[in-house]
Amino acid sequence: METEALLNEKISVQQARQEFANYANNIPEPMMVSVAPPKANPSVSSKTKQQQHFKPGKATKDKATTKCCTIS
């Protein structure tokens, strides 16, 4: 019973991916143009956020790696 449910879930995921691929391929060009600028703005802000958090991120990453090493 559980394996059948998992198979049904996998099928539904594949169907959803196919439906999304069909939808993405059928989007008209003017709609793509109108959707592109809002995507560009968050990417710019995320880049600035990454730059701001990049230097402290190195320190936290080093701490995280030392914690992982001590645990292992």
From Swiss-Prot:
An annotated GO cellular component: heterotrimeric G-protein complex
Residues making up the propeptide: 70-72
Lipidation (S-farnesyl cysteine): 69
Topology with respect to the bilayer: Peripheral membrane protein
Lipid-carrying residues in chain (S-palmitoyl cysteine): 68
Residue ranges of the region described as Disordered: 32-72
Modification Cysteine methyl ester, positions: 69
Localization per record: Cell membrane
Main localization (coarse): membrane
Function description: Gamma subunit of the heterotrimeric guanine nucleotide-binding protein (G protein) involved in glucose-induced cAMP signaling. The beta-gamma subunits (git5-git11) promote binding of the alpha subunit gpa2 to GPCR git3, which senses extracellular glucose, to activate cAMP-PKA signaling and repress sexual development and gluconeogenesis.
Family: Belongs to the G protein gamma family.
Summary of subunit composition and partner proteins: G proteins are composed of 3 units, alpha, beta and gamma. Binding of the beta-gamma subunit complex (git5-git11) to the alpha subunit (gpa2) facilitates interaction with GPCR git3.
Protein name: Guanine nucleotide-binding protein subunit gamma
